[in-house]
Amino acid sequence: MVTGADGFIGSHLTEALVRAGYDVRAFVLYNSFGSWGWLDRCEADVRNKFEVFAGDIRDPNGVRAAVKGCDAVLHLAALIAIPYSYHSPDTYVDTNIKGTLNIVQAARELGVQRVIHTSTSEVYGTARYVPITEDHPLQGQSPYSASKIGADQIAMSFYTSFATPVVILRPFNTYGPRQSARAVIPTIITQIAHGLRRIKLGALHPTRDFNYVSDTVAGFICALRSQTGIGEVVNLGSNFEISIGDAARAIAEVMGVEIELLSDKQRLRPDKSEVERLWADNSKARKLLDWQPQYGGLDGFRRGLSATVEWFKEPANLRSYRSDIYNL
């Protein structure tokens, strides 16, 4: 079962698992419109080849019903927008921490063979050293990252306390088709695609390690198949660092335009909350999971950007995004 299957990474993962021959149950957030999120637009060769369970990760009864009969759970469902976490932190505790507790509790009771829990590089806070290894100190610099630290600890506690077979994957900044406009790369692409040349962003100097979505998905599948990852925390990162400003300029180059970058006050994090530097050491993933990024380095980043830009430029896709508002 894939939780968060209606979201950005989850929809790509669901498609990849179906294509790899797995029987997949897709856990999507219940809504009165009957929408399956991005799964509504999945590729024709995948559509109708997975089972959908509509529920809420915060509800233990629904989660247990969804987990029943599954050999493995890939848990991606979460609230992830950092700005929204500043004014609605309770929802992050309920969804990210309690939701994870519901998953591992159901997995323990039902004898699930593998739980792959999704962490985030944000739990490291500003890097104290680079590249960042999995034993780097955890620093909750936003309510979001604090909630994910709590979720990680809950998941790992079930491994240490009850031998629940948990693997924690810690992706660095994933990007690609279908990503929310609240993320920096879609924000830049959609502003340019809508004809803007003065691009509004938050801070331009922080650095990030960007993962193309197919690399992140491959990491999940490697963790599902591997016999050596249980009880481990594993970074998924490209081992390539670039500033937000330079990433924006790389996007403009791919799109063949010249831009001016503006630091918009409302997009800035509080001073002590900004994560200044993230750069992954991915050697553990290479060794334990036999995983390696296909879009690493500057050349790989540009290839990933090109594929992402092409998707966003499709009119049917671009219509789903608004560049005239600040997306929390």
Language model features by range: what are they?
Residues 1-174, 303, 307-317, 321-322, ...:
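N-terminal Rossmann-like NAD(P)+-binding domain of SDR-like oxidoreductases, especially those catalyzing
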Residues 44-50, 135, 162-165, 189-200, ...:
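A short C-terminal helix-loop "cap" of Rossmann-like NAD(P)-dependent dehydrogenase/epimerase domains
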Residues 58, 87, 95-98, 135, ...:
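Residue-level signal for the nucleotide or nucleotide-sugar donor/cofactor binding architecture
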Residues 73, 216, 220, 236, ...:
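Non-catalytic, hydrophobic alpha-helical segments
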Residues 149, 174-187, 194-199, 213-214, ...:
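Glycine/proline-rich active-site loop of Rossmann-fold NAD(P)-dependent oxidoreductases
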Residues 150, 154, 158, 187-188, ...:
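Hydrophobic alpha-helix immediately C-terminal to the catalytic Tyr-X-X-X-Lys motif of short-chain
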Residues 203, 231-234, 243-248, 256-277, ...:
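C-terminal "lid/loop" region of Rossmann-like NAD(P)-dependent oxidoreductases
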Residues 213, 233, 268-296, 303, ...:
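Conserved C-terminal active-site "lid" loop/helix of NAD(P)H-dependent oxidoreductases
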